[in-house]
C-alpha cells in the first residue's frame, strides 16, 4: 500500500485520536497531543459526513471538557485549525478555545 505524505498524516492522526478515545474510556485524562488529535478527528470526520464549517466550529468546542484533560491543557490550547475536505472543496475550520 502506497500512501502520500498527506494520507500518512491523516492515518497517523486517526490512530492518535482512536488511542485518545480508548484512554478516555478507561477514565484517563488526556494530554495536549491527545486532545488536539481528538478534536481534529472530530472535525475531519464531520466534514466527511457533510456537516458545515459553522456546525463544526461549534461542535468542536463540545468534544472535550476541562475534566477530560490534564491540568494546564485548556490554557495551552487557544485554537485548533484543520484543513478539512468538504463536499464542495477544502476549507479551513478554526475552533477557538476548544476546551471549555
From Swiss-Prot:
Q: Name one GO biological process term.
A: urea catabolic process
Q: Which GO terms describe its cellular component?
A: cytoplasm
Its annotated pathway? Nitrogen metabolism; urea degradation; CO(2) and NH(3) from urea (urease route): step 1/1
Similarity section: Belongs to the urease gamma subunit family.
Task: Please name the GO terms that the record assigns under molecular function.
Answer: nickel cation binding; urease activity
Record lineage: Bacteria, Bacillati, Actinomycetota, Actinomycetes, Mycobacteriales
Superkingdom as given in the UniProt entry: Bacteria
Protein name, please?
Urease subunit gamma
Record Gene3D superfamilies: Urease, gamma-like subunit
This protein's species is Rhodococcus jostii (strain RHA1)
Primary localisation category: cytoplasm
Q: Where in the cell is it found?
A: Cytoplasm
Pfam families associated with the record: Urease_gamma
